[in-house]
């Protein structure tokens, strides 16, 4: 709250949306680590080591290449056009309906995605802390989102650049602290710790079997495409980058962030190995759901300091992804649908505050709806379906950037809606259609290609 007060004094709508383009690039780079490593990552990655070893690092290697592509291809475009909402590019290139379609798909996917991630983290916090005080889940969610609204409603992205830095510090510190505590309990020096992790069977990084879902090429290529789309074509992630002073600083931020992110993931994976070693040495049964491994050990076996660090870390992870998502939703809706830029400052403030409150309420309602469903498979299915909306966004941007053809703008919404539906049915019956082949992350690429094909069909040369 103190950071919010300091950063939001005299903040206008320009500060809320762009940070007045004065953010220090190194703060943006460090803060993006926490925003990218959501609460789901914080809980899931260490436990998943027991199932897939370090194979996740292959995907992260693709992420790093994707970050570099965003830095050299997309950031120059956004700075050249001086964009606030990145979906304004679609208006310039195709027309108003294409523009609204791209932005609408972002709003749906980001709202559901942010709610899903916050729902999972709120569930852990509810069991670990709030249930002891008989605080109902809905109140936990209202207070959580309410706090985010309080510290972001005035300063927006200008505040988030600074709060994300603090949240990333808490998140990474929690992991490092847990590793140190485990290594001390096992009497391992620094060198022995590194040797123990690197020699453990769970530290295998590369998998070359083609029929394995962990195959290097599948993971690496998927990592590239998913990053280009879910970072480079995502208002949430790009809004932070566009607060840097100029293109050069934004690119510098992206390159430094990519290395920081890579190191952070190695820490999470290393923690996973240490958790399994600790459990094995102490005869602790591994939970049926590996997602429960880190919370179970942190809160039940490592002592109060680690338990507190874990709760701080997971809270930081939840807030760092949810606060920027809420601000991005407000920005996109205000600019892309309410045309906020054409009004005077007083009217802009009213529109911005109203939009911010609207999406705060929607976020709460979606999370409570997930809880009411009380069926994890249904909730996960809703999250996956929302993820299909990124395919048309990929197709629209790629076609707009690399083709000079002019589309019939009124047909673009139909193409954008059809591509995910076609993709869904192909994915559902892929094992029958393609001799047992099952789609994974590459489904995003297929979705984008179907969109591009559809756009080609409804387009003509200039």
Give the location of each predicted region:
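Membrane-embedded helix-loop-helix hairpins and adjacent transmembrane boundary segments
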Residues: 1-462
């Amino acid at each position: 709250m103190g950071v919010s007060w300091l950063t939001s004094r005299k903040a206008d709508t320009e500060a809320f949306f762009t940070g007045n383009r004065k953010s220090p690039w190194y703060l943006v780079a460090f803060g993006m680590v926490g925003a990218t490593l959501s609460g789901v990552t914080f809980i899931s990655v260490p436990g998943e080591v027991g199932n897939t070893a370090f194979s996740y690092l292959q995907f992260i290697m693709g992420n790093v290449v994707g970050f570099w592509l965003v830095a050299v291809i997309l950031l120059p475009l956004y700075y050249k056009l001086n964009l606030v909402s990145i979906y304004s590019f679609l208006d310039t290139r195709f027309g108003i309906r294409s523009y609204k379609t791209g932005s609408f798909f972002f709003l749906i996917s980001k709202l559901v995605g942010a709610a899903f991630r916050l729902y999972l983290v709120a569930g852990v916090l509810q069991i670990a802390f709030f249930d002891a005080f008989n605080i109902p889940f809905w109140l936990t969610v209202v207070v959580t989102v309410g706090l985010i609204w309080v510290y972001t409603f005035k300063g927006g992205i200008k505040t988030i650049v600074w709060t994300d830095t603090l949240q990333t510090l808490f998140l990474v510190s929690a992991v490092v602290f847990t590793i140190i505590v485990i290594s001390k309990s096992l009497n391992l020096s620094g060198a022995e710790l590194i040797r123990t992790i690197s020699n453990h069977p769970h530290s295998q990084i590369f998998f070359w079997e083609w029929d394995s879902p962990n195959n290097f090429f599948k993971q690496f290529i998927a990592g590239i495409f998913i990053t280009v789309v879910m970072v480079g074509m995502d208002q949430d992630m790009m809004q932070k980058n566009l607060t840097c002073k100029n293109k050069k600083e934004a690119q510098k931020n992206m390159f430094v962030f990519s290395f920081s992110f890579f190191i952070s993931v190695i820490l999470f994976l290393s923690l996973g190995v240490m958790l399994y070693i600790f459990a094995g040495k102490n005869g602790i049964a591994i939970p049926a759901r590996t997602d429960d491994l880190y919370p179970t050990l942190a809160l039940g076996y490592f002592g109060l300091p680690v338990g507190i660090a874990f709760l701080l870390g997971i809270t930081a992870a939840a807030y760092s992804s949810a606060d920027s998502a809420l601000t991005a939703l407000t920005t996109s809706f205000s600019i892309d649908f309410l045309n906020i830029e054409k009004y005077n400052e007083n009217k802009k403030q009213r529109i911005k505050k109203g939009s911010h409150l609207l999406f705060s309420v929607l976020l709460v309602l979606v999370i409570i709806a997930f809880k009411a469903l009380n069926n994890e498979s249904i909730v996960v299915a809703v999250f996956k379906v929302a993820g299909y909306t990124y395919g048309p966004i990929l197709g629209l941007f790629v076609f707009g950037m690399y083709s000079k053809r002019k589309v019939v703008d009124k047909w673009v919404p139909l193409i954008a809606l059809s591509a995910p539906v076609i993709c869904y049915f192909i994915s559902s019956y892929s094992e029958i259609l393609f001799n047992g082949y099952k789609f994974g992350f590459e489904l995003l690429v297929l979705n984008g290609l179907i969109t591009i094909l559809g756009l080609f069909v409804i387009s003509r040369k200039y």
